[in-house]
């Protein structure tokens, strides 16, 4: 047994970027000051993959770019020493990006997602939340831990978030069912 008990401290930054291209300097600032283990970005709004470039070479970047429509998009950036691997991704309607990391022999799935808008039809919402449930179930069936970070466009309501000023809407109700 080693005389040093070393533990890995995992830190996560998650944010709706509302367009990352003009904010890369801010992203570099976050990376250099906070040194997060994981960064989950929603609504990157890049038109092609490979546009999210940062000064640090310590990160592996996984992206989901919308193919048919503008907006949206996801990026999950992971420190390379966590041995990240791509697991799965959704599409323009189910914006989900799943990456697996490894810490001290433990597998952890990072689910990064961007939920449907309040005005989207119910079919799209059901498809999205079903996909989230599938990803969670698959991880659980394989005894893999989960980190779930998203912009769910929720309006979660007070039942989920104490003092939420919004009344619960459809996405909030779907999240409540998921929990």
Regions found by a protein language model. Name each.
Residues 1-179:
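A shared catalytic/ligand-binding motif for oxyanion handling
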């Amino acid at each position: 047994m080693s005389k040093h008990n070393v533990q890995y401290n995992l830190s996560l930054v998650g944010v709706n970027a509302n367009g990352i291209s003009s904010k890369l300097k801010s992203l570099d600032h976050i990376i250099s000051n906070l040194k997060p283990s994981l960064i989950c970005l929603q609504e990157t709004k890049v038109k092609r993959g490979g546009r999210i470039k940062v000064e640090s070479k310590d990160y592996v970047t996984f992206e989901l770019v919308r193919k048919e429509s503008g907006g949206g998009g996801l990026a999950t950036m992971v420190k390379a020493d966590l041995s990240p691997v791509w697991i799965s991704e959704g599409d323009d309607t189910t914006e989900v990006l799943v990456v697996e990391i490894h810490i001290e022999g433990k597998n952890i799935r990072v689910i990064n997602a961007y939920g449907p808008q309040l005005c989207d039809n119910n079919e799209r919402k059901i498809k999205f939340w079903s996909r989230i449930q599938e990803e969670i179930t698959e991880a659980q069936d394989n005894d893999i831990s989960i980190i779930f970070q998203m912009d769910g466009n929720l309006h979660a309501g007070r039942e989920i978030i104490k003092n939420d000023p919004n009344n619960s809407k459809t996405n909030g109700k779907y999240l409540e069912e998921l929990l």
